[in-house]
Design a protein with these regions (language model features):
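Short alpha-helical hairpin
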Residues: 34-54
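N-terminal extension/subdomain marker
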Residues: 1-36
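A general marker of short, structured functional hotspots
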Residues: 16, 43-44, 53, 121, ...
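Residues that form generic nucleotide/phosphate-binding pockets
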Residues: 14, 41, 46, 75, ...
Length: 185
């Protein structure tokens, strides 16, 4: 039987790592958002995801098993209380996740259908993803799709002539649900 660690979902590739000290004196922004929408977590959709980083010193984002990932995504979709993700903005304008990498990565995984085996992960691991990681990702995807549904299904429900009524209500709610942010200086 595999160890518990081997059953955890590896979401480490979903937030780029960067030296916490990396800095450039070009930051002039003083206003910061107070929450992140799920649409900001899509690849190539906006400014947030390309700017977000995880400090090199932080642990790997691979401590949650499939059930915990599913439960968190379900809690978000249902509009339940989610603790704030703590962020810090560098002088270069990079956004570092100080606390909440697993929460943020789980939502990025859902929005992009990458549970450690797709676009982000393939790029970071240069196409070399271990078979056990692929299997864990597949199992996680199946559980998420069964218990929550695919992110793309929620998007499709908004324009469908005959959507699933429950999915449609949740899709409409996702327009106003966001992950809260706390900024530190």
């Amino acid at each position: 039987m595999p160890s518990k660690k081997n059953r955890n979902v590896n979401l480490d590739a979903l937030i780029q790592r960067e030296d916490f000290e990396a800095s450039d004196e070009n930051n002039t922004s003083t206003s910061k958002v107070s929450s992140i929408s799920i649409r900001d977590m899509k690849i190539n959709n906006g400014f947030f995801l390309p700017s977000v980083r995880k400090p090199d010193f932080q642990r790997e984002t691979a401590d949650w098993d499939a059930e915990k990932v599913v439960h968190f995504i379900q809690s978000f979709v249902n509009g339940e209380f989610i603790p704030s993700v703590i962020l810090w903005r560098s002088q270069a304008g990079l956004i570092f996740v100080i606390d909440g990498s697993h929460r943020l990565s789980s939502l990025i995984a859902w929005a992009n259908d990458d549970y450690g085996d797709k676009e982000f992960s393939l790029e970071v691991y240069e196409g070399e993803i271990p078979n056990d990681q692929k299997q864990i990702a597949k199992t996680t995807r199946e559980k998420v799709n069964k218990e929550v549904g695919q992110y793309s299904d929620y998007i499709a429900a908004l324009s469908s002539k005959h959507p699933d009524p429950e999915v449609l209500v949740k899709a409409r709610n996702l327009a106003t649900i966001a992950l809260p942010i706390q900024w530190i200086d």
